[in-house]
Amino acid sequence: MIVPRLALPISLALQRVSRRVAEHPHNLRILQRHMSSVYFRSGAIKPKPEEMPFGLLAIFCAVIPGLFVGATISKNVANFLEENDLFVPADDDDDED
C-alpha cells in the first residue's frame, strides 16, 4: 500500500530531472559531479577505503561508558529533586494497572 503511494511522486521527480537534463545539457555534468566521489577524473574506480580494525569494539567502548555516565547523572538529579521536595512521586500513581 505504501509502495503505490511513493511510486507516483518518485516517477514525477524522475520525469522532472530528465526534462531539466534534456533542456540544459550542462545539468547532466552537475549530476555526474555529485556521484564522482567513487571515481577519479579519469573514470577509474577509486580503491576501497581502509576499514578500521576493531571498529565495533571502538563503538562499544564509546557507547557503554556514555550510557553509564548518563544513568548516573539522571539518578543523582532524581535524588536531588526528591531530597529537596521539588518532585516527589506519588505512591497512588502506581496502582492504576
Curated annotation (Swiss-Prot):
The keyword Transport applies. The keyword Flavoprotein does not apply. The lineage of its organism: Eukaryota, Metazoa, Ecdysozoa, Arthropoda, Hexapoda. InterPro entries: MCU_reg. Disruption phenotype: RNAi-mediated knockdown in muscle results in mitochondrial calcium uptake defects. The chain crosses the membrane at residues 53-73. It holds the Pfam family DDDD. Its main location: mitochondrion. One of its GO terms (biological process) is mitochondrial calcium ion homeostasis. This is Essential MCU regulator, mitochondrial. One of its GO terms (cellular component) is uniplex complex. Keywords: Calcium, Calcium transport, Ion transport, Membrane, Mitochondrion, Mitochondrion inner membrane, Transit peptide, Transmembrane, Transmembrane helix, Transport. It comes from Drosophila melanogaster. GO terms for molecular function: calcium channel activity. PANTHER family: ESSENTIAL MCU REGULATOR, MITOCHONDRIAL (PTHR33904:SF1). The gene is EMRE. Belongs to the SMDT1/EMRE family. Residues 1-35 form a transit peptide. It is a single-pass membrane protein. Essential regulatory subunit of the mitochondrial calcium uniporter MCU channel, a protein that mediates calcium uptake into mitochondria. It is found in: Mitochondrion inner membrane.
